[in-house]
Amino acid sequence: MNENLLSAMEKRLTPEYEKMLKNINAPKEVLIPPQDARRTLSVLPDGRIRAYGIDTDEYGKKRWVYYESENCGLSWQIHYDDTVLQEFTYIPEKGRYITAKSCEKGYNDGLYVFYSDKGPDDPEPHVQKIWDVPVGDIFQFQKSRYSDRIFFTAQHMDENDFYPDIFYSDDFGETFSHVTLPLQPKQELVYPHKGYRWRYFTGSEPVLCELSRDTLMLLIRNSTDCFFACCSHDGGLTWSDYEKTGFYGTATTAFLLPLSDGRILSLWNNTKPLPEVNHYRQDGLTDENKLGVWEDAFTNRDAAHAAISDDGGKSWKGYREIFLNPIRNNTDFRYAGGRFAKGDKSIHQFQAIELPYGKVLIALGQNAISRRFLIMDLAYLYETSRKEDFIDGLNNVSSHMYLKSYNGANGAEPNGHCQWNRFPGAVMMPDPTWDGKIGTPHREVVLIRKTDDDRLRTPIGGITWNFPMSRKGKVSAEILLTEKSLRFTLSDRWFNSCDKYAGSLSPFTFEVDTDDIASEFVTVTIRYDVDARRAEVYADEKFLFFVDGTREVPTGISYLILQCVTDGDSKGAYIRELRAERID
């Protein structure tokens, strides 16, 4: 963020709003925005923030609008939008408002750049066609910190797939050059997959970040388990070969925000979808679907993450959940939001702008039922411990299972694009150790169990909990195991709590049973060391056993997954409290 724009935002704050902004630490919801995240946010030179999009009334009637905030996103006012530019990037060095459009508002035959030196509401901005090929998923313009170069990214489609494109100008948008990169690697059919993911036309949606003078990094969406990246050391003219990154995420879109002090903020979905089933035994799919053209159902778009780099992207801290899909547990997930909410209901896709006092405003998600604006303090990503006592219920864990509902993969169903309805894999129940006396402190705790039910795609009950990433640390869970066993998994990414392969695909996993621990609440503690590939397990500080790591971990541990995976039905386990901390 340009420091003049940061200063302008700060000057608009009253003492009361300044105090409110400074008091925010953990991510705080501030708006349901009018458009899916990617390029809705724009900052004016006087510090106002706009969010452009479409308002839909209860009858399905749509109208262009923008929301405007005069206090760094703490509150918003809606306006009807009849402007031409809409979302823009302001270039202070030129006093220019600039954007790119394709396949919208009649500009369907190529890629167009719009700019104005008068203001964002200019009714007659300059318009020029810069490429004859239509593009999609355009990201906002960025201005180099080291030169007059401006650039943006998009993707174009041919008969093979979506290709990543980088467009740049050295004269503030008067003329443009562009580079098209090759296709990235695709998912291969390797067990536990028995069918193909969405691997053709899943998008590249390239995200660009300037690391230093002439050095750029591109983070690219694809169908494998990880994002791929490539770098340019000549300002974007030529690019390296693709390399696999330490950012997990399948068929989702990331965002990189260079900060005014040189740090970089990364936003993405550090998630793993369920293994693909044999699509030839699945109803409602076309032959193209079965070969990996388009998706059947998304199972990794319910958790959003953030990390921060102090060294130009060489290493990252945090790996923290910043938001969980508010409808992730809905049994009518496909219908949540009503008849006009037919699209994806996810919290993938991101945009962010820097705010004063070390805060950021984050846009994330798709569909009005799921998408949000958040304000977060960057210090949140440097925390080294976390505690969960479930006083707020299941707000801070993922626990949903999937029903054998329609998936809406081909748009034939009335609602729910590429979605399955959900079922709770954990519930809040009375603490079974409460003595029942009135006036005696009592509370509810989490119950997870396994129940064979032919309505479910997998019967495993569990919870998935995030904490600050570390390579060496301690995690504990206060549990009451009522029958059979409970599986513990430490992982470097989010898994569905109903995924039976979460343990085998993670660095550390083990089970404890009723022979290992007493029939009362016991604190199971795991001390792990990623570099040593070894973990120690204790029950109420009594050593139980070692666990050897099963694979290399490029980042660190940031997840505890508790699952009831026994044979047949089980009464399961109660969970009262979770704790995690880094060990230096």
Where are these regions (language model features)?
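Short tryptophan-centered beta-strand motifs in secreted/extracellular beta-sheet-rich domains
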Residues: 475-477, 519-537
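Flexible glycan-contacting loops in extracellular carbohydrate-active proteins
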Residues: 544-577
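Secretory/extracellular carbohydrate-interaction modules
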Residues: 435-513
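Extracellular Ig-like/FN3 beta-sandwich strand-entry sites
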Residues: 470-472, 519-521, 557
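Beta-strand-rich interaction surfaces with strong enrichment in secreted/lumenal proteins
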Residues: 243, 461-467, 510-516, 549-550, ...
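Extracellular carbohydrate recognition and processing domains
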Residues: 325-333, 508-522, 546-552
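Asp-box/BNR beta-propeller blade signature and adjacent active/binding-site loops
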Residues: 1-398, 402-426, 430-431, 452-454
